[in-house]
């Protein structure tokens, strides 16, 4: 099924529409109430930054490739909005494994450690 989280519904292409709540915690709570237990974010610098700024990210899967990209290719936008200090604290993330994807590319998994 294809579900849409947006300010307004669209005429076609989606099986279900969720109104865009004011904050990410509220949006994720609405999705959870609908039975969504896991959401995968595949990209979008601003979306990634918004979810990190709201401290709504529970896991990271990063690929390391022997190629440096920056500027418009960065996965987080260059803004003045800081990320929560808790994300940079020792013990905020725990390594869950590394996988060799071949051709010098690695997938590194981290899980967010939350207190309480």
What are these regions (language model features)?
Residues 1-116:
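Enzymes that bind and transform nitrogen-containing heteroaromatic metabolites
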């Amino acid at each position: 099924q294809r579900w849409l989280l947006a300010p307004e519904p669209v005429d076609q292409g989606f099986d279900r529409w969720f109104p865009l709540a004011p904050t990410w915690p509220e949006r994720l709570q609405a999705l959870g109430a609908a039975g969504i237990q896991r959401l995968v974010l595949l990209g979008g610098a601003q979306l990634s930054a918004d979810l990190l700024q709201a401290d709504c990210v529970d896991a990271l899967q990063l690929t390391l490739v022997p190629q440096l990209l920056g500027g418009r290719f960065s996965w987080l936008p260059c803004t003045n909005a800081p990320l929560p200090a808790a994300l940079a604290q020792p013990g905020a993330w725990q390594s869950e494994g590394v996988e060799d994807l071949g051709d010098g590319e690695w997938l590194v998994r981290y899980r967010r450690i939350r207190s309480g």
